[in-house]
């Protein structure tokens, strides 16, 4: 646990400054009420249709290979990458037996929130590139649009992006378009 905390501190220093200012989860001086304030301000400007996207079992389904590739773009020390990979695969105890983990992030681990933000940073950058107004808090995303039709198109295109490019599943039952009053 101590090694994970130390690793998280070093990675936080390297990554946090490059995260989107629309990413609010697990970050210094960024809280859920800040995300709410951003969305409220957008609604006051006429953006009244929200895409509420839920990523299905996000922490349990993060692709290790993809995450390691993302980390390797910034971290050039192979020993650090190897250490993180070992932490990811360290396993879970099931019926007294330790099983190595092939996918997912350990929930409650000191490194997991930061790794989650690193993994989802690509989604934030894509939303910014497309000019969307959004707020993301951990694995919860709200994207706000001017019309219902725009919101429905946005939900469809983001679902494709998340599933095809980021290799995550969107929870269709919990993801929807709603009017913001």
Question: What is each residue range found by the language model?
Answer:
Residues 4:
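Glycine-rich active-site/cofactor-binding loop and its immediate structural neighborhood
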Residues 11-18:
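Short helix-capping/linker segments at secondary-structure and domain boundaries
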Residues 18-181:
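Conserved polymerase palm-domain catalytic core
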């Amino acid at each position: 646990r101590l090694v994970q905390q130390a690793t998280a501190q070093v990675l936080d220093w390297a990554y946090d400054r490059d995260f989107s200012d629309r990413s609010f989860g697990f970050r210094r001086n960024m809280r859920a009420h800040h995300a709410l304030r951003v969305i409220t301000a957008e609604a006051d400007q006429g953006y009244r249709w929200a895409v509420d996207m839920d990523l299905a079992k996000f922490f349990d389904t993060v692709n290790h290979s993809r995450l390691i590739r993302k980390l390797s773009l910034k971290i050039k020390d192979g020993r650090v990458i190897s250490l993180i990979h070992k932490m990811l695969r360290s396993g879970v105890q099931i019926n007294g037996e330790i099983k190595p983990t092939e996918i997912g992030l350990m929930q409650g681990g000191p490194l997991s929130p930061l790794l989650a933000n690193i993994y989802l940073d690509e989604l934030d950058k894509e939303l910014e590139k497309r000019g969307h107004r959004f707020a993301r808090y951990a694995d919860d995303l709200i994207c706000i649009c001017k019309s219902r039709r725009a919101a429905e198109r946005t939900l469809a295109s983001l679902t494709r992006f998340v599933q095809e490019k980021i290799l995550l599943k969107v929870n269709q039952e919990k993801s929807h378009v709603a009017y913001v009053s």
